[in-house]
Amino acid sequence: VLLLDTTNLSAAAFAATAVAALGALAFRRAAGLSAGLAVPFTLVLALVAMGVNVRGEAVRVMYPKNRLAWNKPVLRSLWNSHAHILAFLPEVGPAFYWGGGDGAAQFTNTQAFVVVDGEAGTPMTEWDGNAASLDWVSYDVTTLPYHLRKGGRVGIVGVGGGRDILAAIWSGSPAITAVEIN
């Protein structure tokens, strides 16, 4: 975790490779065997790759969990004790609907996507602070509870990029309690 706090996954992987190469070299020497060129070559290659990658993402994790992560420009790449979080650069485009339906009105907004471990993606939508500018959320299936009961108190588990908070604000909820675990 210390390496992930100070570098990125690729640099940490290269560092682990370098440590493994040193360990292999030590075991070979302890057994009285020649190290040959393979271990020093691996060590040098890992250290060079780590040095190139330590502050940027020259070598980026593109396939976490054996699937292509979004190949877009990254604003931030962060780690915590159990997840890799990518925040992509904001883009202007069609409003994001989890389920807008065929008759959903088309709105445009600025949004950035956040992806956790290459799996769980969520939009972060730019908002001007005016509840009237949130009408676009009313066309999403996730706002069905608010159509049935506007103005109720709201509890949200898994805030993500805040999309559910925007829906609660749109509905006029007087109190919103939100919890994010990751």
Feature roles, as predicted:
Residues 1-182:
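Alpha-helical transmembrane segments of multi-pass membrane proteins
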